[in-house]
Each structure stands twice: as C-alpha cells, then as structure tokens.
Amino acid sequence: MAVEMFYDDDADLSIIQGRKVAVIGYGSQGHAHSLSLRDSGVEVRVGLAEGSKSRPKAEEAGLTVGTPAEVSAWADVIMLLAPDTAQASIFTNDIEPNLKDGDALFFGHGLNIHFGLIKPPANVTIGMVAPKGPGHLVRRQFVDGKGVPALIAIDQDPKGEGQALALSYAKGIGGTRAGVIKTTFKEETETDLFGEQAVLCGGTEELVKTGFEVMVEAGYAPEMAYFEVLHELKLIVDLMYEGGIARMNYSVSDTAEFGGYLSGPRVIDAGTKERMKEILKDIQDGTFVKRLVANVEGGNKELEGLRKQNAEHPIEVTGAKLRGLMSWVDRPITETA
C-alpha cells in the first residue's frame, strides 16, 4: 500500500508560527524541536522539572524554561517528548489540568496514546510528529538547510485542523524539506516496538552475543570473536544504511557474500520467523506494554536486573578493553576500564 507523502509546498509554516508551543523535555529530540522551531519563527518554551540537569543547557541556548505545568498553561500546542514511561504521570499532573478547548497535544511516539495510558479530553487535538532520526541529526540537517524525513499522525481532531497543524510543525523542524509520511498511532507504535525488539535491539544483541559465545566456546580468543561479531557489525550496517542489502553485498568480498547466502537462512529460519510473529502479537495485544507498566510500577526492578545480567556478559569485558585501544571511539561514561 502506497504511503501519502508531503513536502514543503504542502505545509503552511504560518500556522505553527501563530501558535504558542511548549516542548516538554530537552533530550535528544527536545533540543532539536525547540531550537529549530524557534529558528523558524515560532514562540517556544521548554518544560523541565525544577532541578533538571537540562535546564542550564536550554537556558544557555536562549530558550525560555518553565516547569511542565507552567509551560502547558501558557501554550496552545504541547509537544510531549519525555521518556515513554514518564509521560502518563506528566500528563496527569502537569498537562491535563492546564488543557484548554482547542489546544493540541503532540507526541514523538504513539505508545501512550495507542495503548490508552494517556486518555486526553475530547476537545483537544491529538497528533504526532516523529522525525526518523536522532535529535542531533534533526538539528544538524535543519541548520544546514536540509531535513530528516518525519512521520505525522492524527488520533483526535475535534476542529478538523490536526493534519495542517502537524504538517506546519513538521515544516518548522525541517521535516517537509526531506518528506513527511502520513501514518497512524497504531502503525507507528507497533512497527517501532517490533523493530526495536525483534531486530534492532533485542534481535541484533542476542545474535552478536550468541556468535561471540560460539566462537569462544570453540577455543578462539575473545578478542578475535569480539572483532568479528561486534566491531565489524558497524561496517556492514553502514553499507546497508547507505544503499540497502544489495549495496552491502556488492561491497563485501565474494567469499563473504556467498557464505552469507548459504548460512544466513540457517541462523534465521522459519522457526525464527514464527517467533518474531509471536513478538509482534505480544506488542499488538498489549502484553508487552502491560509488562512495561508493571516494571515501572515495581520500581524498575525487572529492568535493572536485566541490565545487570547483560553488563556481566563476557563480551562487555572484552569490548571495554579493546575499545580502550581505539582512539577514534568515544567511550561512554559507563566504561571506566
């Protein structure tokens, strides 16, 4: 099914320029949205809790900062870019009491709306503007006069202005320069979660760890295993990112290409596909989100346990040591080895 695309000529920037926008959060996406909207002539305020470490950064950038409640009361368009697990409480405590007839509440991801964790009043426009790239790229492309493709969706539209407003907002952060795709909260949420769990985060992580274990258990040095299954992964992903799977296969050796064709289906087989379908079903029917909410309500104990277990895997010890030899790699603050 063909998607509906929009570009600069399809969006009226004056719509968002005539509104007052509150951006809740100043992380990766929050800083890109706030600064780019401001540079597009939009009146913007940033909502951050008292004592937030991001407050000085936003203020140094010349942005007006208030608490989430303060900026929500001031604004008529609110973009909620706090972490998924914090959004429901921010909505209940800070946003909902300050919503007025005709306001718009936008999101960068649809989870809380799609799964009913946030239930907004009927007189508020509910929409999504979601750039398909990290915030630093969104901002850099905007400054360079370009843009990152974005998604828009409208879930609730009491005044019939939602799509025009979302397109205007997307233009304000550079999205329509590249192209904006119209989707739904359901489609964006379920595809995003599936991609993260089955392929990008969960699937890739387990593939790498298992490959490392197989090599080390067969007697190969952990350092050699690390280079082959993790370090070189970036080279392959970069090729796929730039030109698809065909570009990757064109760029690697014939030996690597031929071996990949033969062995790839032995690793990812019909059974894997069936299990991926089960993961998708758990996402669609809300099983995953129920567990996510239970984890948060339980003080993140399950998540912390999984993090600890993951951090203790031998590949992490080996990787920390080897990355210390790589002057071109920015080592994260979690590594002290």
From Swiss-Prot:
- Family assignment? Belongs to the ketol-acid reductoisomerase family.
Residue numbers binding substrate: S253
Cofactor(s) needed for function:
Mg(2+)
* Annotated source species: Nocardia farcinica (strain IFM 10152)
Q: Which SUPFAM superfamilies match?
A: 6-phosphogluconate dehydrogenase C-terminal domain-like, NAD(P)-binding Rossmann-fold domains
Pfam families registered for this protein in UniProt: KARI_C, KARI_N
Active site residues according to the UniProt entry = H109
Q: Which GO terms describe its biological process?
A: isoleucine biosynthetic process; L-valine biosynthetic process
The KARI C-terminal knotted domain covers: 184-329
Kindly tell me the pathway this chain contributes to. Answer: Amino-acid biosynthesis; L-isoleucine biosynthesis; L-isoleucine from 2-oxobutanoate: step 2/4; Amino-acid biosynthesis; L-valine biosynthesis; L-valine from pyruvate: step 2/4
Location of the KARI N-terminal Rossmann domain: 3-183
Q: Any idea what this protein is called? A: Ketol-acid reductoisomerase (NADP(+))
For this chain's record, the cofactor binding note is: Binds 2 magnesium ions per subunit.
What's the Enzyme Commission number for this chain? 1.1.1.86
